[in-house]
């Protein structure tokens, strides 16, 4: 699936139906509202000088941490585009606050001591979640508002704290890459890491191994939901025809949607995908598809205008 980018402001619409999805058990990160726009272009600019300064600052921090006898902690990143190091100090955010104030819908008020430490260095905090005996805080140095409430996040990082002390930092291979955005907790104690694109996708899972190693690895093949009573396969970025088959293999049955004059929904129904429930005619072209299983209801959301659109995320309402 080609990643979506746009600079067209488009027309805003009522998104109360889609916004409601974020109030249940969700695979989506805390993210921008789903507003509409009519075209996609690749015009999100990067601040190269700002990014270079940030990367240099991180390099100095890593070097200093290695020389000051920080606690021994094994950290492993299995992802080629995200690095992770044991560190003991966090650099200040580069640039000025104006680089981070254009996407308030992505920024949270820091509440934990760990998140407050990050905010005190000038970073925009996006997520603050438990990670076993640790705490993971994602934050960014630059946020670029895109169309209809969407946002492109760069200079994203994940700080890992233990007893309110910084012990590790995950960061992208370059400051201009939207490699890291928000975080969502998973059943079992792991944390899902999302990218910072305007239509976010998960990039990996952060977990604590039995020996205490912090490991950032690829997205799991399946997620346990509803206290382990059901499984959801990894259908991210999968076309809807393949995703519905993968869901069926895990016991999720399609729920027939209602009649709709929306052309894309009608076309999906003609293809035999009768669970298409609603489609946005403009913007990121979200469509929802409903399923039911022994543990509850699942709503799959796709993005894009392909005849068979690709999965952006899912939401589960447990019984």
Where are these regions (language model features)?
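N-terminal signal peptide c-region/cleavage motif recognized by signal peptidases
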Residues: 61-64
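Exposed acidic/polar residues on beta-strands and adjacent loops within beta-sheet cores, strongest
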Residues: 67-319
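Extreme N-terminal basic, low-complexity initiation segments
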Residues: 2-11
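Bacterial N-terminal signal peptides that target proteins for export
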Residues: 32-53
